[in-house]
Amino acid sequence: KFSVVLERTVRELRGERCLNIEDDISSKKQIVVSRSFGERVSNLETLKPIVSNFAVRAAEKLRSERQKCSQVSVFVRTSPFNKNKPQHSDLRTIGLITPTNDTRDILTAAKKGLLPIFRSGYDYAKAGIILNKFTNEHVKQHSLFKDPNDPKQNTKLMKYLDQMNSYETQIYYAS
């Protein structure tokens, strides 16, 4: 007649351990990489490499969590504190056909999301990438419409790129 929570509370008050702290460690539900700019950005060609860099960092974080994502969101916004300038804020979400943690796929989605939300004539103060809809990296899902490249090669390539980026050298992607 009691709820599960009340039953656990009673049992724990009697000295019986019901939940381990380690049992409740859950992986992240989303990864956000964003920054406010020191100087306002009003040019798409300046904004593209910034957003690309955010996508690369987000993909690295995703792999460090041993996850894949099915959704990439890109956002841009002007400063809400500068009332004298025109305001613009937008977000575009791109669904991925199959879950991925491949930087190249996330970069492609980020670029696809950035182009329709950018408006010339605005001084952007912040941009970012949001990854969500995670699955475990060991779960394999293939698309009927996409010829999967050798997933082992993609995994190895991303591992090597992460190792190279963790040293003093850094790989830059053309965007």
What are these model-derived regions, one by one?
Residues K1-D123, V139:
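DNA-contacting surface of Y-family translesion DNA polymerases
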